[in-house]
Curated annotation (Swiss-Prot):
It catalyses: Couples ATP hydrolysis with the unwinding of duplex DNA by translocating in the 3'-5' direction; ATP + H2O = ADP + phosphate + H(+). It comes from Streptococcus pyogenes serotype M1. Keywords: ATP-binding, DNA damage, DNA repair, DNA-binding, Exonuclease, Helicase, Hydrolase, Isomerase, Nuclease, Nucleotide-binding. The lineage of its organism: Bacteria, Bacillati, Bacillota, Bacilli, Lactobacillales. Residues 512-798 form the UvrD-like helicase C-terminal domain. This is ATP-dependent helicase/nuclease subunit A. Heterodimer of AddA and AddB/RexB. One of its GO terms (molecular function) is double-stranded DNA binding.
Length: 1222
C-alpha cells in the first residue's frame, strides 16, 4: 500500500496486488499454454518472472529471452509496489545497463498509457522519474557510489578519481617496484632474494621477467575478495601442501590411471582392425601383435591393482615401469593410417616423470617463494599507499574499499540489506570472487536473483570464474531450501538447422571436465516456436576447409593468421548468398578469435567489392601503416642518420625505392670508416664518390637527387614552421594524403593521417614545441606498449560485419561465418615460468642446481629448470580451464546465428583421417582426445569421424584451388557507383590544407579581436549553436565525406516549374501546428486537418506537411502518448530570456529564444524540441543540437529552480518520426 497526495493535498491510497503464490503461478502457466498465440511465454519464463521470496538462479541458454525475463520481472515488482530504487540491478557492461534502463523506461511509458487509474499513473510516473537514480549499472559503478558516500569510514576521501590510463598505472607501478627492489637487494635476506630474481630473470640486472611476475601476482590477487588475506594464506598453499608423493591429489592419480586404461582400450581396438595383421603367414602371432598384447595386459593389470602394487608412495616406480613398457613414439600405423594411441599417455608420463627428484629439490625453492610472497605483499601495500596519496585508484581498489566498508560497518551493511528488496545480477557466469563477495554483503540471504549461462562464460582473462555459477547450480539443486534453479531452454533466435548442429556438437564435446558443465538434455537448445522448426535444406551447417595438400604458400608465415584461400572461400559464399538469394550484406557476420591479423580479410573483400565493417579492433593507431610511415618520415627529418627510419621512408610510396636500389646504395661504403650510416652513403652516391659508383645508374641517381632535395626542404621548414604545417607540407609535396585514398580502408587511412596533424597541433598548443619532443613523446608511448586512441570513421551500414566472438556476445545475425577454425588455442600461459591458481596459489619452474646429483666436479653448477609439483597441478588445471573456455567460445559463436552457420578452416585432406578408431566409445569424445585437440576444426573433424553414423547436422567439404578461380568465385551483381576518372584532378590534400589554413587564420583573428568588437547584446540559441559545432571534426571524417561529393550543379533554372517549398517554412508550419493542436481529442487525420486550417502558412507549405508522420508520433511513440497523458503539465512555444557571460570577452549579453515544448512537474522538467532536418543517422542531429538543448535546459532551471531530467529531440525529417534522448 502506498500513499500519495492529490492536487487538493488529500492522501491517495494505492493498493497493490500481492506477489503470486506457487499455485497462482501454475494457474498462469496453464492459461498461457492455452492462449491462441504464436509467440507465448514459456512456463519457465513465467516461473522466473513471478517467483518471489527466495534466491533464484536462472540458467538461460542462448536466445532464451533472459533480458525479456529480467525486464518483465522488474516491471512486475514495480506494479506490486516495489519502488525501482529498491532494486539492485547489476549488469556486466555500461552498455548493457543503458539498454536495460531504456527497456524498463519504454515498459513504464507503455504501462502508463494503458493504465486508466489516476493514482497508478502518478505512481508509475514517479517510478519513471526515479529510473535515472536507480541502481542499474556495473558493479564498478556501484562500488564508486558506496566509496564516495562512506569512504570516510575507512579513511578514504570522497574526492578521488579513477586511473583508467594504463600508462599512468605503469609509471606508478614502476616507481614503487624500483624503490622496493632496491630495498630488498640491500636487506638481510638479500642472497635469497637475488636467487629468486635469478630464477626468473637469469640475472639481477635484467629485472623485466621478475617485474612481470610481481605485476601478475598483484593483478591476480586483486580479483579475490581480500587480496591481502589471499596473499598471506593461499599464495603458498600448494607449496606447503604438496611436498611428498603421498600429497599428490587423488584426482590427478585417477587421471593418470584413466589415461593408461584408455591407451590399453585404444590399442586393443587397433589390434582388432581387419588390416592390422595379428598373424604371420605361418599362422602364428606376429611379433608386433605379441608386443601390443603385452602392453594391453600390463597396463590393465597395473590400473586394476594400483593400490596393492604401487600406491602413492610407489608412483615414481609406476612411471618408470610404464615408460619402459610403451614405445617412445605416439602412433600405431595400420594400412598407412597413423593412430595416435600413445600420445595422451606420454603427456601424462611427462607430467609425473622424475617426481622423486623434483620433490627433493622442490624444498630448496620454498625460501624463494617466501621472499616472493613478502615482496608482493610489500608491493601491494606500497602501491596502494601511493594511490591513496594521489587520491587516484583503479576499479579493483574501489571494489575492495566497498567490501571493506560493508564488512567493517554493520550499520551501513544492514541499511543496504534492508533497503534492497532484491539483488539482481545479469551475466552471473562472468562474475569473479570479488564481485560475488560484494553481492553477498548486499543481500539479506534470501533475495538474490541471478541470471546467466555457464556455457557462455568467456571472460576468464578478466578472472571471471564460472565455478561460482556452477556451485550455486549444484547447491540449489541439492538443497532447494537454499534457492531455486529455473532452466530457460527454449531458444527464440535460431532456426532448427542452427539448434540441431549446436546440440549435436556439444553433446559430444562438453562435460564437467572440459566445458565445466555436462551438455545433457537440461542444457540442450529447444526451438521456442513452430516457425523455427520449418526445415530449410540449403541452411544446413557447413565446415568448409581449404585443402592444404598442395598449399602454395598463400598462408601467412604466422600460423595464427587466416590464409588468402580461406577468405576467398568466404567471399565466394557471400557472393552466392547475395546474388542468388538476395541476402543483404548486413545480414552476414564474420566471427574471429582475435582482432589482430585480419587485414587480409579487408583486403580480399575489397578485391571482390564486398563492403565490410569492422568492430574497431584493438588500439593500434600508431601501428597503422600510414601513421608509421609518417612517424619514420618525421624521425628522418629530425635525424637523417637514423638508418631504420630512413630505410622505411625510402621504401614508402612517397619515394618508392626497391630492394635493388637500397642494395646499390648500401655498397657505397667508405672503406676508411668503421661505421658508415645510410645517409652518408646516399650523399657519396650522389657525388660519385662511393665505393662502387658504377652501380648508381641514371634513374637511381635522379631518385636520390629528388629525395635529398625534398628532405632538405623539409628539414629547413621544420626549423621555422609549426609541426602541424610541416606534416601538411609533407602531404602536399609527396601526395601521400592522396595516395592512401586509393588504397584499401582509404577513409580510415586518411582519417588517421589527418588526426596525426591535429595531434601534433594539440601537442604544440599544450606548450611543447619542436619535432624532437613530439617524436620522444610518441616513442615513450610505444615503449610502454601503449597506443593512442584509434580514430573512428563512420562504418557503412550495408556491409558485412567483422567482429570478435567476445564482441558478438549478446548479439544475433542471420548468417554467421566462424573464421580461422584451424587456429590453435593459445596455450602461452601454461608454458610460463609460473602459474597462479586461486586454491593452490603459485606454482613455479625452479632452476635447480643438480651438480651434486650428477657427481659433477669440473663445473661450478649444473642448472636445470624443473616443474615443481604445485606447478604441474596448476598447469593441468589451467590447461583444462583454457580448453573449457575455448569450447564455450565456440558455443557462443555458433549460437549467434539465426539461419545458418559456416565453419571456415584449412586442413590437409590426406592427413585429416588420423583420428582414433570409432569403436567402443560413448556419447562423448574421450577426455584424452579432447585434451589433445587444440582447434575448433580438430574438434569438429573428430566428431564427424568418430560419430559418422549419426546425423550431426553439418557437412564437411574440402575446397580445392580449382574451386577458387576468378570464374568460380564470381562477381557481385552491383552497378559501378563511381567512375575513378572523375577524381583524377581532385587533390584532396591541397583542398584540405587551404581550408585549414583559412580556418586557422580566421580562428586566430576571432580569438584576438572578434569577442570584444562584435559581441551582440542579444543572441539566440541558433546563433550560439554555430559556436559549439566544430568546423571540422577532429578525426577528419567530415572532410573526407565532403571531398567525395560532386561539384555544384550550375544548370539554368526552369522558370516554368513551381518554386520549391523551403525547408525552414515547413519547420515553422510544424511548430505552429504542434502549438495549436488540441491534445484533449484523439489525434487522427481529421484532428490534424482541422488544426492545420488555423495556422498562418500558405497552401503549398500546408500541403508539404506530412500529417501521417505527425499522427504516427502521437499514436505510435511513447513520447507522443506522454503528451496526451500529461497535457495539463505541458507548455508549448514558450519564450525565455536569460543573462549569459561571453567566455572570451567576459561581457554579459541576453540570450533569447522559444522552447518548443516542456512538461513542468513538481520536482522536475521534461524538455522536448522538434526538428525537421534531413538526416542519415539520428546521432548526427543529436550531436548538432546537444548544446542548444543544454541552453534551453539552463533557461528552464534558472526560471523554475528545478532540474531538467529528460531532453528529447523529435526528428521529423526521416521516413518516420524518431525520438532521440539527448
Amino acid at each position: 500500500m502506498l500513499f500519495n497526495i492529490n492536487e487538493k493535498g488529500e492522501p491517495l491510497v494505492i493498493s497493490f496486488a500481492p506477489f503470486l503464490s506457487p499455485e497462482a503461478i501454475k494457474h498462469l502457466q496453464e492459461n498461457e499454454r492455452c492462449r491462441d498465440q504464436s509467440q507465448k511465454r514459456t512456463a519457465q519464463q513465467i516461473e522466473a518472472i513471478y517467483t518471489s521470496g527466495q534466491n533464484i538462479l536462472v540458467s538461460a541458454s542462448a536466445g532464451s529471452g533472459k533480458t525479456f525475463v529480467m525486464v518483465e520481472r522488474i516491471l512486475d515488482k514495480i506494479l506490486r509496489g516495489v519502488s525501482i530504487d529498491r532494486l539492485f540491478i547489476s549488469t556486466f557492461t555500461v552498455k548493457a545497463a543503458t539498454e536495460l534502463r531504456e527497456r524498463i523506461e519504454n515498459k513504464l511509458y507503455s504501462q502508463i498509457a494503458q493504465t486508466t487509474d489516476f493514482q497508478m499513473k502518478v505512481y508509475l510516473t514517479e517510478q519513471l522519474q526515479s529510473l535515472c537514480q536507480a541502481d542499474i549499472g556495473t558493479m564498478d559503478a556501484f562500488a564508486q557510489k558506496v566509496v564516495s558516500r562512506y569512504g570516510y569510514s575507512i579513511g578514504i576521501s570522497s574526492q578521488f578519481r579513477i586511473m583508467q590510463d594504463k600508462a599512468e598505472q605503469d609509471v606508478l607501478k614502476q616507481e614503487v617496484f624500483s624503490k622496493l627492489f632496491n630495498e630488498f637487494m640491500n636487506q638481510k635476506e638479500a642472497p635469497v632474494f637475488r636467487a629468486l630474481v635469478k630464477n626468473f630473470s637469469g640475472n639481477c640486472k635484467d629485472t623485466s621477467a621478475f617485474r612481470e611476475l610481481v605485476y601478475t601476482c598483484y593483478s591476480f590477487s586483486q580479483s579475490t575478495e581480500n587480496p591481502k588475506i589471499w596473499l598471506q594464506e593461499n599464495f603458498l598453499s600448494a607449496a606447503k601442501t604438496y611436498q611428498r608423493l603421498e600429497d599428490i591429489p587423488d584426482h590427478d592419480i585417477e587421471l593418470l590411471l584413466l589415461a593408461m586404461q584408455d591407451t590399453a582400450n585404444q590399442l586393443r581396438d587397433v589390434t582388432d582392425m581387419e588390416d592390422y595383421g595379428q598373424l604371420t603367414k605361418a599362422g602364428s602371432r606376429s611379433a608386433k601383435y605379441t608386443k601390443h598384447l603385452t602392453i594391453i595386459e600390463k597396463l590393465s593389470d597395473w590400473v586394476r591393482d594400483f593400490k596393492c602394487l604401487y600406491g602413492k608412495a610407489g608412483l615414481d616406480r609406476l612411471i618408470r615401469d610404464v615408460t619402459g613398457l610403451i614405445p617412445s613414439g605416439n602412433d600405431v600405423t595400420v594400412s598407412k593410417v597413423k593412430y595416435p594411441v600413445f600420445k595422451t599417455l606420454h603427456q601424462k608420463l611427462k607430467q609425473f616423470r622424475h617426481l622423486e627428484t623434483i620433490l627433493m629439490y622442490q624444498k630448496d625453492c620454498f625460501s624463494l617463494l617466501e621472499q616472493l610472497q613478502d615482496f608482493v605483499l610489500a608491493f601491494s601495500e606500497a602501491y596502494l599507499a601511493v594511490k591513496i596519496q594521489e587520491s587516484a585508484f583503479e576499479f579493483s581498489d574501489i571494489a575492495h574499499f566497498a567490501i571493506k566498508i560493508l564488512e567493517e560497518n554493520t550499520d551501513i551493511r544492514q541499511s543496504y540489506q534492508q533497503h534492497y528488496h532484491e539483488v539482481m545480477v545479469d551475466e552471473y557466469q562472468d562474475n569473479n570472487h570479488m564481485q560475488e563477495r560484494l553481492l553477498t554483503l548486499l543481500s539479506n540471504g534470501h533475495n538474490r536473483f541471478m541470471v546467466g549461462d555457464i556455457k557462455q562464460s568467456i571472460y576468464r582473462f578478466r578472472q571471471a570464474d564460472p565455478q561460482i555459477f556452477n556451485q550455486k547450480f549444484r547447491d540449489y539443486q541439492k538443497k532447494p531450501e537454499q534457492g531455486k534453479v529455473i532452466l530457460l531452454k527454449e531458444n527464440f533466435r535460431s532456426q532448427s538447422e542452427v539448434l540441431n548442429v549446436s546440440n549435436a556438437v556439444f553433446s559430444h564435446l562438453m562435460d564437467e571436465s572440459v566445458g565445466d558443465v555436462l551438455y545433457d538434455e537440461q542444457h540442450q537448445l529447444i526451438a521456442g516456436s513452430h516457425a523455427q522448426t520449418v526445415p530449410y535444406l540449403d541452411r544446413r551447417a557447413q565446415l568448409l576447409l581449404y585443402n592444404s595438400d598442395k598449399d602454395d604458400g598463400n598462408a601467412p608465415s604466422d600460423s595464427e593468421g587466416i590464409s588468402f584461400s580461406e577468405v576467398t572461400i568466404v567471399a565466394k559464399e557471400i557472393i552466392k548468398l547475395h546474388n542468388d538469394k538476395g541476402v543483404p550484406f548486413e545480414d552476414i557476420t564474420l566471427l574471429v578469435s582475435s582482432r589482430t591479423r585480419n587485414d587480409i580479410i579487408s583486403h580480399t573483400f575489397n578485391q571482390y567489392g564486398i563492403p565490410i565493417a569492422t568492430d574497431g579492433g584493438q588500439q593500434n593507431y600508431l601501428k597503422s601503416v600510414e601513421v608509421m610511415v609518417m612517424l619514420d618520415t618525421l624521425r628522418t627529418i629530425n635525424n637523417p642518420r637514423n638508418d631504420y627510419a630512413l630505410v622505411a621512408l625510402l621504401r614508402s610510396p612517397m619515394f618508392a625505392f626497391d630492394e635493388d636500389d637500397l642494395a646499390r646504395i648500401a655498397l657505397q661504403k667508405d672503406n676508411e670508416l668503421d661505421k658508415d650510416c645510410l645517409y652518408d652513403k646516399i650523399q657519396r652516391a650522389v657525388i660519385g664518390r662511393g665505393a662502387h659508383p658504377e652501380l648508381i645508374h641514371d634513374t637511381l641517381l635522379g631518385k636520390l637527387n629528388v629525395f635529398l632535395k625534398t628532405l632538405k626542404s623539409w628539414r629547413r621548414y621544420a626549423k621555422l614552421g609549426s609541426l602541424y604545417d610541416l606534416i601538411w607540407k609533407i602531404f602536399n609535396d609527396r601526395f601521400y594524403f592522396d595516395f592512401v585514398a586509393s588504397q584499401a580502408k582509404a577513409e580510415q587511412a586518411q582519417a588517421n593521417l589527418y588526426a596525426l596533424a591535429l595531434r601534433a597541433n594539440q601537442f604544440e598548443k599544450s606548450g611543447y614545441k619542436g619535432l624532437y619532443r613530439f617524436i620522444k613523446m610518441i616513442d615513450k608511448v610505444l615503449e610502454t606498449q601503449n597506443d593512442l586512441a584509434d580514430v573512428e570513421v563512420a562504418t557503412p551500414k550495408q556491409a558485412v560485419n567483422l567482429m570478435t566472438i567476445h564482441k558478438s556476445k549478446g548479439l544475433q545475425f542471420p548468417y554467421v561465418f566462424i573464421l580461422n577454425c584451424d587456429k590453435r588455442f593459445s596455450m602461452t600461459d601454461i608454458h610460463k615460468s609460473f602459474i597462479l591458481n586461486r586454491q593452490h596459489g603459485i606454482g613455479i619452474k625452479y632452476l635447480a642446481d643438480i651438480k651434486g646429483l650428477l657427481g659433477e666436479t669440473t663445473l661450478n653448477s649444473v642448472k636445470v629448470s624443473m616443474e615443481t609439483l604445485p606447478y604441474q597441478l596448476n598447469k593441468q588445471e589451467l590447461r583444462l580451464a583454457t580448453l573449457s573456455e575455448e569450447m564455450r567460445l565456440l558455443y557462443v559463436a555458433m549460437t549467434r546465428a539465426e539461419k545458418k552457420v559456416y565453419f571456415i578452416g584449412k586442413a590437409s585432406k590426406s592427413k585429416s583421417q588420423e583420428i582414433t578408431d570409432p569403436k567402443k566409445l560413448g556419447k562423448l569424445l574421450p577426455l584424452a582426445l579432447r585434451e589433445q585437440l587444440l582447434t575448433f576444426q580438430d574438434w569438429l573433424l573428430a566428431i564427424a569421424d568418430i560419430f559418422s553414423t549419426e546425423d550431426l547436422y553439418f557437412d564437411v567439404r574440402f575446397i580445392e584451388d580449382s574451386d577458387l578461380t576468378q570464374e568460380s568465385v564470381g562477381r557481385l551483381q552491383t552497378p559501378q557507383l563511381l567512375n575513378p576518372d572523375d577524381l583524377k584532378d581532385n587533390r584532396q590534400s591541397e583542398t584540405i590544407a587551404r581550408a585549414l589554413d583559412m580556418l586557422e587564420a580566421v580562428s586566430q583573428l576571432n580569438a584576438n579581436y572578434e569577442a570584444a568588437i562584435h559581441l551582440p547584446t542579444v543572441r539566440t540559441p541558433s546563433q550560439l549553436k554555430a559556436t559549439y559545432e566544430p568546423l571540422l571534426e577532429p578525426i577528419g571524417v567530415d572532410i573526407i565525406e565532403k571531398s567525395s561529393r560532386s561539384l555544384s550543379d550550375f544548370t539554368l533554372p526552369h522558370f516554368s516549374k513551381k518554386a520549391k517549398v523551403e525547408a525552414s517554412h515547413i519547420g515553422s508550419a510544424l511548430h505552429q501546428l504542434m502549438q495549436v493542436l488540441p491534445l484533449s481529442k484523439p489525434i487522427n487525420q481529421q484532428t490534424l486537418l482541422d488544426a492545420l486550417r488555423g495556422i498562418d502558412s500558405n497552401e503549398e507549405v500546408k500541403t508539404a506537411l506530412d500529417l501521417k508522420k505527425i499522427e504516427s508520433f502521437f499514436c505510435d511513440t511513447s513520447l507522443g502518448q506522454f503528451f496526451q497523458t500529461y497535457q495539463k503539465h505541458l507548455y508549448r512555444e514558450a519564450p525565455f530570456a536569460i543573462l549569459k557571460l561571453d567566455p572570451i570577452s567576459q561581457e554579459e549579453y541576453v540570450l533569447r529564444g522559444i522552447i518548443d515544448a516542456y512538461f513542468l512537474f513538481d520536482d522536475h522538467i521534461v524538455l522536448v524540441d522538434y526538428k525537421t532536418d534531413k538526416y542519415k543517422q539520428p546521432i548526427e542531429l543529436k550531436k548538432r543540437y546537444q548544446q542548444q538543448l543544454e541552453l534551453y535546459a539552463e533557461a528552464l532551471t534558472q526560471t523554475y529552480k528545478l532540474p531538467v531530467t529528460k531532453r528529447y529531440l523529435v526528428l521529423m525529417g526521416g521516413g518516420k518520426p524518431e525520438i532521440v534522448e539527448v
